[in-house]
């Protein structure tokens, strides 16, 4: 089987993972103690388990996942929470002191003490796989552990498991809802370090998700659990085709093949529909056509940027539930007639479809309504460069005064790393500009002939 190991780093990574595993268990009919529910036992055997779960001799399912954090609080909550019986106790690794929102602590001083222990556990989980497909790494850009330790882990995974794909789910610091002053530093340093190690990075921006929760679910003040449950639906949709059967299945490597035209341009924009509250569910038609169109509206996207100003390079539409290929093709045909959706001219068709017949599950007493079909769209668009430019300008403001830099240098980092990381990000922004501009030049060439 094609197994996938999830690695959850730092507070954001661990808490998103909690929501994801809660959802996977519901989808596969696994109880919080790791054993199957009675109705699941009665149904046909499910072979999709083994992608994310390993089975022990006595019929218990254990997630192939590792939690790592430099401070114990978040992981202690998992150790004592409702799902404490599900996870392998040795796969919960926490340190004694945290990274204090400092990339250098996560990457150099504090992180260095924990990394070998984490990699040892990764190796054990990997040895237990018959055909390891790759890693999903969950972390945030803004925190110290997520950025520093997350980057260190990615570097070391590249050394130990060079050819295996590594997909990142990263929480991008939101413009309005910042949790620390040094987020721009951490984000740019971690992006610079992981750029060559990640094959595909799905960014999620807290503010965009706050807005979706407020607007679509009517939550006045969403908390992290509300946000994480929404993120979990997205992660579940992306991984559904690896775990269930469908008519058009998508494999981990297929994501990169279809979404990443150049190795550095690997930050797809994620959109998910329908996000509707239980109260409104009965009044929505929720047709394949409607869902597909709503994915192209900025309101349903997981990062604040406007794709109408950018160009699409590639788009993956992952449907799940009651969707027949015919409907999906019809929806795409309609999309192609829309003038607002512009593709770069060197990538004419650009739509990849995936259909998984397992309908989306909802957490009981959650905010999302139960729907019979959903779609998750992953699109590589040049508009996501807007996210980088906002971050870069904040970085420049602080770095021009060398504010807070002594905390990083004090942990053994060199100041040159800041300017190096900033230059790398500037190069990334230029790469995006060039990709969008290529299509403009192409038009002139045609005119000459």
UniProtKB/Swiss-Prot annotation:
Coiled coil: none
Localization terms from the record: Cytoplasm, Cytoskeleton
Cofactor: Mg(2+)
EC numbers on record: 3.6.5.-
Positions annotated as active site in the UniProt record: 254
One family name in Pfam for this protein: Tubulin
GO BP annotation list: microtubule cytoskeleton organization; mitotic cell cycle; nuclear division; nuclear migration by microtubule mediated pushing forces
Catalytic activity: GTP + H2O = GDP + phosphate + H(+)
Broad class of the protein's primary localization: cytoplasm
Main EC class the enzyme belongs to: hydrolase
Residues under site feature: Involved in polymerization: 449
Residue sites binding Mg(2+) per the record: 71
One GO CC term on file: nucleus
Binding, GTP: 11, 71, 140, 144-145, 179, 206, 228
Annotated keywords: Cytoplasm, Cytoskeleton, GTP-binding, Hydrolase, Magnesium, Metal-binding, Microtubule, Nucleotide-binding
Superkingdom classification of source: Eukaryota
Quaternary structure and partners: Dimer of alpha and beta chains. A typical microtubule is a hollow water-filled tube with an outer diameter of 25 nm and an inner diameter of 15 nM. Alpha-beta heterodimers associate head-to-tail to form protofilaments running lengthwise along the microtubule wall with the beta-tubulin subunit facing the microtubule plus end conferring a structural polarity. Microtubules usually have 13 protofilaments but different protofilament numbers can be found in some organisms and specialized cells.
Known role: Tubulin is the major constituent of microtubules, a cylinder consisting of laterally associated linear protofilaments composed of alpha- and beta-tubulin heterodimers. Microtubules grow by the addition of GTP-tubulin dimers to the microtubule end, where a stabilizing cap forms. Below the cap, tubulin dimers are in GDP-bound state, owing to GTPase activity of alpha-tubulin.
Matches recorded under PANTHER family: TUBULIN
Full protein name: Tubulin alpha-B chain
